[in-house]
């Protein structure tokens, strides 16, 4: 049987004629890797002093948060009254975020520092919070409570860290918010 198949193949090739040869492509020189990969004009430096990017789809400060049922029947955290300006009597400042897909659980940390607040040292942390993000979580929040019961007017900086612990490599970005001076009632 195999010899019959081979004989038919030879006859068929003979009847069809010789197949046309493809034109040979010219040999091109190999371009250096920097010409097409890791080009300096394509590299945008990452700004750790700006709101985090990368794994964060959105991140914002807000007066509160709400939990809604997402379209995949997951719990979705949404900001309530997003703003970066708060009153001194605000009970807490919330940082609400939505994440891109991730393949393992981790923690998101927020460390609050007074950036420009009269009477407070900008190098001393005044508050922090952490949230464990499970594999199925797509959103979350951090809660920052006022130091000594009330916020002092001024500008505050929140370092956002991601990982298992806070260190110099876990910093993803910085959020800022302002506590306005109390208006005369």
Show where each model-derived region lies.
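Bacterial N-terminal signal peptides that target proteins for export
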Residues: 1-5
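Bacterial N-terminal signal peptides
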Residues: 6-16
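Sec/Tat signal peptide C-region and signal peptidase I cleavage site
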Residues: 18-21
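Contiguous segments within soluble domain cores/interaction surfaces
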Residues: 24-148, 152-153, 159-163, 167-171, ...
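Short, solvent-exposed mixed-charge patches
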Residues: 183-185
């Amino acid at each position: 049987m195999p010899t019959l198949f081979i004989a038919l193949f030879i006859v068929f090739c003979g009847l069809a004629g010789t197949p046309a040869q493809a034109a040979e492509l010219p040999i091109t020189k190999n371009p250096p890797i920097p010409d097409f990969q890791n080009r300096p004009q394509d590299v945008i430096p990452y700004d750790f002093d700006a709101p985090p990017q990368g794994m964060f789809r959105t991140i914002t400060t807000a007066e509160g948060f709400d939990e809604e049922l997402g379209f995949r029947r997951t719990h979705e955290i949404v900001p309530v009254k997003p703003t970066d300006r708060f009153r001194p009597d605000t009970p807490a400042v919330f940082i609400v975020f939505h994440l891109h897909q991730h393949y393992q659980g981790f923690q998101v940390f927020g460390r609050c520092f007074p950036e420009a607040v009269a009477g407070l040292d900008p190098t001393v942390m005044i508050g922090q919070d952490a949230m464990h993000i499970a594999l199925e979580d797509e959103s979350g929040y951090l809660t920052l409570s006022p130091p000594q019961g009330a916020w002092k007017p001024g500008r505050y900086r929140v370092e956002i860290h991601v990982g298992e612990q806070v260190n110099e490599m876990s910093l993803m970005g910085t959020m800022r918010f302002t506590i306005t001076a109390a208006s005369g009632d």
